[in-house]
From Swiss-Prot:
It comes from Escherichia coli (strain K12). The keyword Repeat does not apply. Disruption phenotype: Mutants show increased numbers of double-strand breaks. The single ralR and double ralR-ralA mutant have increased sensitivity to the antibiotic fosfomycin. The keyword Ligase does not apply. Signal peptide: none annotated. Keywords: Antibiotic resistance. This is Double-strand break reduction protein.
Amino acid sequence: MYKITATIEKEGGTPTNWTRYSKSKLTKSECEKMLSGKKEAGVSREQKVKLINFNCEKLQSSRIALYSN
């Protein structure tokens, strides 16, 4: 289990702290792609996000039990 933390910056928005738990290790670019808005029909651009202070750490087995319940 991995704990992923970062600060999300979106155009026109205030920075937001973000945490996600994942069974697999994710890269910064994978997380940015996941969080960016999807393109819709009739919309000329998608909303991109930028992650700062990105960190992906493997949790110790004793800490995993706390988050899997």
